[in-house]
């Protein structure tokens, strides 16, 4: 985080993290571990006068490569709720991709993904529009 963000001295950082942890890509994890890691990044950024935008974890119904991961939507909901509360309590910004991209199963809408996890071009277009609007308001453009 130091070399990727702090050393570059940005005005704002958008943090979108957590899905790889939820999927088990980095080993076993839980909501507290995931959110503590994200909160640590936010604390480091804030200490370096970088405004922080915490982004919701994108919806995922199932990680096909990790069938042992049970009920990702519940974990994602819990992480997102913690992120939103933390942002509100600490004067940070919260960027809600989730509500614009979720389907009725609490997965990523098919129109936004090739595999149920990663956004496609249309998904990234939606996300960039949401992020741009938030950043413009933060930076007074």
Where on the chain are the PLM-derived regions?
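Alpha-helical cap/lid subdomain in secreted, periplasmic
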Residues: 1-141
